[in-house]
Amino acid sequence: MFIDQVKIYVKGGDGGNGMVAYRREKYVPKGGPAGGDGGKGADVVFIVEEGLRTLMDFRYQRHFKADRGQHGMSKGQHGRKSEDLLVKVPPGTVVKDEKTGQILADLVTHGQTAVIAKGGRGGRGNSRFATATNPAPEIAENGEPGQERDVILELKVLADVGLVGFPSVGKSTLLSVVSSARPKIAEYHFTTIVPNLGVVETGDNRSFVMADLPGLIEGAHAGVGLGHQFLRHIERTRVIVHVIDMSGLEGRDPYEDYVTINNELKEYNLRLTERPQVVVANKMDMPDAEENLQAFKEKVGDEVKIFPISAVTKQGVRDLLFEVANLIETTPEFPIHEVVDESDTSVMYKFETEGVKFDITRESDGTFVISGYDIEKTFKMTDFSRDESVRRFARQMRGMGIDEALRARGAKDGDIVKILEYEFEFID
């Protein structure tokens, strides 16, 4: 089975907790704080493994959670950073954020890496909070939570040439005679439902990878007939070979097929029209093919170069392969999105918080609910088992303007305020 799209969950490791500790050595009066910081949580890193060809492995494991950092220790010892969690993906994998649709990484070359979920930083130990007025603080931070998200993995086949056209126009047959690939060939539509790859060698010692892509139908750009799953593979090809059935045995008009397929490519991704396209008139060994070809040429004009072939008898195939090889040599690769810098094989996704720092809503029972990335992160990093940490959290809330915002919403002494799953009383 060929798996070309899958949804998975990734979570960076939480940072280790900071420690509250003090020096107790002999001959060290008033030893002072000695709590170490927690270690950084591990990142979830995707790495390209050239030996992989599908996303099949993700059918069986869809949750990837990196290890948290080691907790801080006494005597000022910091916790150890956890080893990053490496997730192997095949070349041609595009990683998208499931919620926003943003492309996080486009992984194409062996060994290329991308950080998909960052681990949290370690919490600070009490030695970090010592001041002239508070030389022995009873306060330490919990580790920062690691980033978590659902991501969509899409595999777009890496091929120099893509064969496109309606079902049963002879794409699989053509691939089978020009390469050692053995795609399934039968007398019914959609025999090919997954891409087939073959290495083509020309007579002058040139070679390229050709992909037999599943047949397209009208409305494919809108998802009709699994159109989105088929069209995504064309985005990586450098040259498009448009195969048209000139026999007319299917009852379709070759020119209408030509126009329909090109419209589908344009509607799906306008940039596909920038790629060189070779028009192949197939099944020229059939009785009415020559007459249909002449009518087709009259409609498309002299600007479109047409290669009449018969994939079955191999008539015209040699000239076609030479033309395709020439186009590949003069055509650059087309990235699927704008690339800022390709000088490094590593990609770092920089996470930026979105939206407001906090939001306040009120439930039907009068409880005030505070939410937002910043306040929830601050809450999770607070050690509520220590009074000094609780007082610090209260100061942080005031500094963020939450107290003032609660008063503006009508909060009074004794009202219940909720953050995540925890409730406490509002004191004015």
UniProtKB/Swiss-Prot annotation:
Tell me which UniProt keywords the record has, alphabetically: Cytoplasm, GTP-binding, Hydrolase, Magnesium, Metal-binding, Nucleotide-binding
| A GO MF term | magnesium ion binding
Per UniProt, GTP binds at 165-172, 190-194, 212-215, 282-285, 310-312
- Stretches assigned to the OBG-type G domain: 159-329
| Residues where Mg(2+) binds | S172, T192
Q: Name one GO cellular component term.
A: cytoplasm
Q: Which residues form the Obg domain?
A: 1-158
* InterPro entries in alphabetical order: G_OBG, GTP-bd, GTP-bd_Obg/CgtA, GTP-bd_prot_GTP1/OBG_C_sf, GTP1-OBG_CS, GTP1_OBG_dom, GTP1_OBG_dom_sf, OBG_GTPase
- OCT domain residues: 350-428
Question: Could you tell me the Gene Ontology terms of the biological process aspect for this record?
Answer: ribosome biogenesis
- Major site of localization recorded for this protein: cytoplasm
Cite the record's note on assembly. Monomer.
Q: Cross-referenced HAMAP family, in alphabetical order?
A: GTPase_Obg
- The protein's name in its UniProt record: GTPase Obg
Q: Which organism is it from?
A: Bacillus anthracis
Q: Which gene encodes it?
A: obg
